[in-house]
From Swiss-Prot:
Keywords: Cell membrane, Membrane, Transmembrane, Transmembrane helix. Induction: Down-regulated by cystine. It is found in: Cell membrane. NCBIfam families: PRK10633.1. This is Uncharacterized membrane protein YhdT. It comes from the Bacteria. GO terms for cellular component: plasma membrane. To H.influenzae HI_0974B. The lineage of its organism: Bacteria, Pseudomonadati, Pseudomonadota, Gammaproteobacteria, Enterobacterales.
């Protein structure tokens, strides 16, 4: 198999995994956090699910792009 496809499949698996992890963390944060006010004055479930979780996953997406994704040529070598 062409190494471009191996890398593309690896990147797709990581993206799907991070997406499913985000969904799981969001659900846990939204439904298991309390309703007591948090440090911003919003309910704790809102702070966890809508403020802290997205910030965490922005960092994880940055790390995934920095360390997992690679620049690969998209043109087909056989077409030239």
């Amino acid at each position: 198999m062409d190494t471009r496809f191996v890398q593309a499949h690896k990147e797709a698996r990581w993206a799907l995994g991070l997406t499913l992890l985000y969904l799981a963390v969001w659900l846990v944060a939204a439904y298991l956090s309390g309703v007591a006010p948090g440090f911003t004055g919003f309910p704790r479930w809102f702070e966890m699910a809508c403020i802290l979780t997205p910030l965490l996953f922005i960092g994880l997406c940055w790390a995934m792009v920095k360390f997992i994704y690679r620049d690969i040529p998209l043109e087909d070598d056989d077409a030239a």
